């Protein structure tokens, strides 16, 4: 009998890339891999590139704040549950793996209604709303931080680490520089604003561009629709809406990285031992998970943190220069970390549940 698994997760790239990192190993073990996502989420374009079957369902966004859509989106979620249940009943997967995000809730419930085992993964230190709603229907919940286990029912939580894409380790420094058109040997700052971009980070770089270019070349991943036309031919500055194949080369070429503090991103930086300046989303714009992630990494000596509330030109440039001058200390701390890539732990758990069901 053929092994079959359905993956789900979406809304941002952080809910998709960990799933993508599992696909090669799953295929190697003989699994037919399929995906359930939304009709127009970022997961659709990312997964289509992987050449696996993609199923579309409806899904409403889960919000912690007042919005008129809060009155209509629950009906979209109910519709999504019915659609996911129908897909899962037809495809008969042995297991469902969820990476969270609002699309995951209907899929997890749909699997539960079909008596299909579900394993989910929470990257952040505290569970997101989608994973909180999904947990009662999951057999196991994988976590990245040991501190997260206290939020999960004891018999469900498993410390696995987060899965890191193998291709990230295969970057070529010269190729990265060539793509960006850099001709000198200035140190390189890579800014990663996330798949949706970050207005604050984009402005931070662009408002200080002249000062930064005196010392650094800059690779700026700014998010969809955020290209600044007036800077398109600026020497030493390369901007991209979103990258995939190029990212390993950009990571390899960069000396320091500026990033938000989503768990997937920061654990990739840790795995690559890249000195980093983290600018976590403020509590006004999030549930505060990125602040907790960033503080944990700063405490362990892996990162330097700049909170949005203390943003100023002077503090930003001072911290960036401090990070560059002390980069070897951060590299050493990261290389001495006990962190391990979570791929094997998660795959072992998937295999365990496949064996139990069959």
Curated annotation (Swiss-Prot):
GO terms for molecular function: UDP-N-acetyl-D-glucosamine:N-acetylmuramoyl-L-alanyl-D-glutamyl-meso-2,6-diaminopimelyl-D-alanyl-D-alanine-diphosphoundecaprenol 4-beta-N-acetylglucosaminlytransferase activity; undecaprenyldiphospho-muramoylpentapeptide beta-N-acetylglucosaminyltransferase activity. Transmembrane segments: none annotated. GO terms for cellular component: plasma membrane. Keywords: Cell cycle, Cell division, Cell membrane, Cell shape, Cell wall biogenesis/degradation, Glycosyltransferase, Membrane, Peptidoglycan synthesis, Transferase. It catalyses: di-trans,octa-cis-undecaprenyl diphospho-N-acetyl-alpha-D-muramoyl-L-alanyl-D-glutamyl-meso-2,6-diaminopimeloyl-D-alanyl-D-alanine + UDP-N-acetyl-alpha-D-glucosamine = di-trans,octa-cis-undecaprenyl diphospho-[N-acetyl-alpha-D-glucosaminyl-(1->4)]-N-acetyl-alpha-D-muramoyl-L-alanyl-D-glutamyl-meso-2,6-diaminopimeloyl-D-alanyl-D-alanine + UDP + H(+). Pfam families: Glyco_tran_28_C (PF04101), Glyco_transf_28 (PF03033). This is UDP-N-acetylglucosamine--N-acetylmuramyl-(pentapeptide) pyrophosphoryl-undecaprenol N-acetylglucosamine transferase. Pathway: Cell wall biogenesis; peptidoglycan biosynthesis. It comes from the Bacteria. PANTHER family: UDP-N-ACETYLGLUCOSAMINE--N-ACETYLMURAMYL-(PENTAPEPTIDE) PYROPHOSPHORYL-UNDECAPRENOL N-ACETYLGLUCOSAMINE TRANSFERASE, UDP-N-ACETYLGLUCOSAMINE--N-ACETYLMURAMYL-(PENTAPEPTIDE) PYROPHOSPHORYL-UNDECAPRENOL N-ACETYLGLUCOSAMINE TRANSFERASE 1. GO terms for biological process: carbohydrate metabolic process; cell division; cell wall organization; lipid glycosylation; peptidoglycan biosynthetic process; regulation of cell shape. The keyword Cell cycle applies. Its EC number is 2.4.1.227. It is found in: Cell membrane. It is a peripheral membrane protein. Belongs to the glycosyltransferase 28 family. MurG subfamily. The keyword Membrane applies. UDP-N-acetyl-alpha-D-glucosamine binds at residues 12-14, 165, 195, 290. Its main location: membrane. Cell wall formation. Catalyzes the transfer of a GlcNAc subunit on undecaprenyl-pyrophosphoryl-MurNAc-pentapeptide (lipid intermediate I) to form undecaprenyl-pyrophosphoryl-MurNAc-(pentapeptide)GlcNAc (lipid intermediate II). Signal peptide: none annotated. Gene3D superfamilies: Glycogen Phosphorylase B (3.40.50.2000). HAMAP family: MurG.
């Amino acid at each position: 009998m053929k092994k079959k698994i359905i993956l789900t997760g979406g809304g941002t790239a952080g809910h998709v890339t960990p799933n993508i990192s599992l696909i090669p190993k799953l295929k190697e073990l003989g699994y037919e891999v399929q995906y359930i996502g939304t009709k127009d989420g970022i997961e659709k374009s990312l997964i289509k590139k992987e050449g696996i079957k993609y199923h579309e369902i409806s899904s409403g966004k889960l919000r912690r704040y007042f919005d008129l859509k809060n009155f209509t989106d629950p009906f979209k979620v109910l519709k999504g549950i019915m659609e996911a249940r129908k897909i899962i009943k037809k495809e008969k997967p042995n297991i469902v793996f969820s990476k969270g995000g609002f699309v995951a809730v209907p899929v997890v419930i749909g699997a539960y209604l079909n008596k299909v085992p579900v394993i989910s993964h929470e990257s952040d230190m505290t569970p997101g709303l989608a994973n909180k709603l999904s947990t009662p229907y999951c057999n196991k919940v994988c976590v990245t931080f040991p501190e997260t286990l206290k939020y999960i029912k004891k018999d469900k939580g498993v410390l696995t680490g987060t899965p890191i894409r193998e291709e990230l380790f295969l970057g070529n420094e010269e190729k990265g520089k060539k793509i960006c058109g850099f001709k000198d040997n200035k140190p390189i700052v890579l800014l990663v604003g996330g798949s949706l971009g970050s207005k604050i980070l984009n402005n931070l770089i662009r408002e200080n561009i002249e000062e930064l270019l005196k010392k650094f070349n800059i690779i700026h991943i700014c998010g969809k629709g955020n290209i600044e036309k007036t800077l398109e031919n600026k020497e030493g500055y390369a901007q991209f809406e979103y990258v995939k194949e190029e990212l390993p080369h950009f990571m390899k070429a960069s000396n320091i990285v500026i990033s938000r503090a989503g768990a997937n991103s920061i654990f990739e930086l840790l795995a690559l031992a890249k000195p980093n300046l983290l600018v976590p989303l403020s509590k006004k714009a999030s549930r505060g998970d990125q602040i907790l992630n960033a503080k944990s990494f700063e405490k362990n000596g892996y990162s330097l943190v700049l909170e949005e509330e203390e943003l100023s030109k002077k503090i930003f440039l001072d911290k960036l220069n401090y990070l560059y001058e002390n980069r070897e200390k951060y590299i050493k701390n990261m290389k001495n970390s006990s962190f391990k890539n979570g791929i094997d732990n998660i795959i072992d758990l998937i295999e365990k549940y496949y064996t139990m069901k069959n």
